[in-house]
């Protein structure tokens, strides 16, 4: 597995930071009907059981917000990806269907409340560190303008920052040419809750993305 560590700066600011990691080979393609139906089922369940005002109190979302706030980020203006996905679903806007990898990200976020990110390892340069981005740091977002990642717990390689619980960079995004990925589950309540989630994520990657050569670890 690619070398991944958590910076002392992040650990000092949020001691319960833990990163669930799955590295594997995959086949990127449009999502199957089975995966789409599974997502539709989960979306219906959420719409029947939650209201928008309750999203920020969901345990994993609340922990992500608490960490980002502790690092100095305005969590009302900059929502984490799981929170934003929940809001979109409860507003009846559905989700964006991009490819099976992106949809597995959505599946895991919607069933757990954890923010996730998946990265094309062929575009990641060298070792990875989960760190706190400094004030004023930006990177080109995926199909969007530059993203302000200052004061966020963000992944960086030997070139620059490329991912965080809010929004990922265009540089390392998954495309139809991607074969080797790193999927990360951003945890802020210690390693223990990630164990079961990683198991379910691995099953989903194998079922929907034909994942192979899989390595799983938790960095805390």
Description of each model-found segment:
Residues 1-220:
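Charge-biased, low-complexity intrinsically disordered regions
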């Amino acid at each position: 597995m690619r070398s991944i560590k958590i910076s002392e700066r992040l650990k000092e600011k949020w001691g319960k930071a833990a990163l669930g990691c799955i590295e594997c080979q995959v086949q990127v393609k449009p999502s199957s009907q089975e995966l789409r139906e599974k997502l539709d089922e989960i979306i219906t369940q959420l719409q029947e059981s939650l209201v928008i005002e309750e999203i920020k109190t969901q345990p994993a979302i609340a922990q992500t917000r608490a960490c980002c706030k502790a690092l100095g980020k305005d969590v009302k203006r900059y929502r984490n990806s799981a929170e934003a996905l929940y809001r979109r679903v409860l507003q009846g806007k559905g989700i964006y269907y991009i490819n099976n990898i992106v949809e597995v990200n959505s599946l895991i976020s919607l069933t757990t409340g954890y923010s996730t990110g998946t990265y094309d390892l062929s575009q990641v340069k060298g070792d990875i560190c989960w760190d706190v981005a400094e004030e004023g740091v930006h990177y080109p977002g995926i199909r969007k303008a530059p993203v302000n990642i200052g004061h966020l717990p963000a992944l960086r390689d030997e070139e620059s920052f490329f991912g965080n619980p809010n929004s990922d960079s265009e540089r390392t995004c998954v495309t139809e040419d991607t074969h080797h990925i790193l999927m990360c589950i951003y945890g802020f309540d210690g390693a223990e809750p990630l164990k079961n989630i990683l198991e379910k994520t691995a099953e989903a990657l194998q079922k929907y993305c034909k994942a192979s050569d899989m390595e799983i670890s938790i960095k805390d």
